[in-house]
Amino acid sequence: MTIKVGDKLPEAKFRVMTAEGPQVKTTDDIFKGKKVALFAVPGAYTGTCHKMHLPSIFLNAYAIKDKGVNSIAIVSVNDAFVMNAWKRDTDQRDEATFLADGNAEFTKAIGMELDASGNGLGIRSHRYSMLVDDGVVKKLNLEPAPGKVEVSGGDTLLGQL
């Protein structure tokens, strides 16, 4: 079942890189008691994700936070080491938390898995943006095609705040 507006996010675990190495963070750690702008991408460093989606998030990050959003998170079905390298390479280290969903646990639990095996990428996440308030989905923008950023970018979510 695909998650929809009004649904509570299911319990899942992410990995986030810290100075001590990868640390487990739960859905509650990330979303409980907070308003979070969540952006999902099919893969770190992939063309559309790196050249289009990520810039749309960072160009709008301050404005999104100015509208009362506590934090911005970016999730991908990648490991914590790849997500940390991607975060470091963006030079936007403090604007967003990069969440590794390495086994697609969260992605599958919300029904957003994408089979990209035909491109040698295995199971990935659909591209979407989501506004989550205290663990409840308030806005959801699912991209109709993985190679485009038409409704899932930072500008769209900003316009909905």
Question: Model segments located where?
Answer:
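Chalcogenol-based redox active-site neighborhoods
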Residues: 1-161
